[in-house]
A protein has these predicted regions:
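Glycine-rich beta-strand-centered segment in the early N-terminal region that forms part
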Residues: 23-42, 50-93
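Residue-level recognition of short, solvent-exposed, well-ordered loop/turn junctions
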Residues: 28-29, 81-82, 143, 216, ...
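Residue-level marker of beta-strand positions
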Residues: 32, 65, 84-86, 102, ...
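NAD(P)H dinucleotide-binding glycine-rich loop of Rossmann-like/cofactor-binding domains
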Residues: 79, 88-152, 184
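Mid-domain Rossmann-like dinucleotide-binding core that forms the NAD(H)/NADP(H) cofactor-binding site
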Residues: 125-203
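Glycine-rich cofactor phosphate-binding loops and adjacent beta1-alpha1 units
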Residues: 188-278
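C-terminal capping/lid region of NAD(P)-dependent oxidoreductase domains
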Residues: 215, 305-306, 310-319, 327-345
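C-terminal substrate-binding/catalytic core of Rossmann-like NAD(P)-dependent dehydrogenases/reductases
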Residues: 267-319
Length: 345
């Protein structure tokens, strides 16, 4: 059978995505589950993270968010049996590409998929759901009555954060990156308190947030990237400046950032200290990179798929791509021209 792999380029060279022949071992491991893949989500490969974790291969398997049907289980598997519909995220060191017809995965990375939830929907949204849940529950400890500012609420991750927060009785403010996204966010139900446009050049972020919170600032800020310096490149011009984020935080607030290389100067740290605020880095990969909190991770995955099934989380539908377009599609995803894609098998 065939799978999608990435041949990492030399230093700055573009990575190459190739369809490669692959096979599974004859004997199934005791705790492994053999799954026939129905849909697979594609997200950018983080080469730096793989390097940091010491995972180095000539061919890196691509496509990790999978949904499918159990075909066979190892003799010590207790959670699943053949014909079960399952969903999960392959660990970073998995030898399998999620884009194979059949994969092998440890039972502790899978949860049951509710019957009425489509494989395509869950494969496309599972990672964003995991990020949103980790940011809001694990890091920010959100509770009813809190105020939350989500940057770029129309992104797939931002939308998940908004829906999850509204479900828990949190007052949500968000920013929009274009007039179309602004309209989309204003029409969301349950509705957000305020949509703040940041595409006009001048950002009124601080005065609007202070007005909406009675001058107190928000309890939680979730960003999707930060501008570190005043000069703007085309890529970063819509991102908030780190000083703006610290300014909108209330006393005891939580800032959850996705910015891997965030640099704070002593005055920034002093400002955070004066507010007794905290900063957390959002790296959802720790759930599969370490087995320290496996039970909690499975509980989160289960909660996400149940909320999707119940209609609490309603991800934007992803258009499905046929398998023969996988290499081209993955190249556009890797260049961040497209956030993600779903391949239906």
């Amino acid at each position: 059978m065939k799978g999608l792999y990435c041949r990492a380029g030399e230093s700055d060279a573009e990575p190459k995505f190739v369809i490669q022949e692959t096979s599974l071992p004859e004997v199934l491991g005791s705790h492994l589950v053999r799954v026939q893949v129905k849909a697979c989500g594609l997200s950018p490969v983080d080469f730096k993270l793989l390097e940091d974790l010491g995972i180095q291969r000539d061919l890196i398997p691509v496509g990790r968010e999978v949904a499918g049907v159990v075909m066979q289980v190892g003799d010590k598997v207790s959670f699943f049996q053949p014909e079960d519909e399952v969903v999960g995220i392959l660990p970073l060191d998995s030898p399998c590409s999620g884009l194979c017809d059949v994969i092998e995965i440890d039972e502790h990375y899978l949860v049951q998929k509710p019957e009425k939830l489509s494989s395509v929907c869950v494969a496309g949204a599972l990672r964003d759901g995991l990020c949103a849940h980790t940011a809001l529950h694990t890091h920010a400890r959100m509770a009813a009555g809190h105020t939350l500012l989500v940057m770029d609420g129309a992104s797939s991750f931002g939308l998940m954060c908004i829906q999850l927060a509204c479900h828990h009785g949190v007052k949500v403010l968000t920013t929009s990156h274009s007039p179309q996204k602004h309209t989309f966010l204003e029409q969301l139900r349950p509705s957000v308190v305020k949509v703040i446009p940041v595409y006009n050049g001048s950002s009124d972020l601080l005065p609007v947030v202070l007005e909406e919170t009675g001058g107190l600032g928000v309890d939680i800020v979730i960003d999707s990237g930060v501008r570190l310096h005043e000069e703007e490149s085309e890529k970063t011009k819509l991102l908030p400046h780190k000083h703006d984020i610290i300014s909108v935080l209330g006393v005891g607030g939580h800032w959850v950032t996705s910015h891997k290389d965030l640099q704070l100067d002593p005055p920034d740290c002093r400002f955070l200290y004066l507010k007794s605020a905290s900063l957390t880095f959002l790296n959802h990969e720790v759930w599969t990179a370490s087995s320290a909190q496996q039970g909690r991770y499975l509980h989160i995955l289960k909660d996400i798929v149940e909320k999707m099934s119940a209609g609490v989380l309603r991800p934007q539908p992803e258009e499905t791509v046929p398998l023969y377009e996988a290499t081209v599609t993955m190249a556009t995803v890797q260049r961040h021209q497209k956030k993600k894609a779903v391949i239906q098998l």
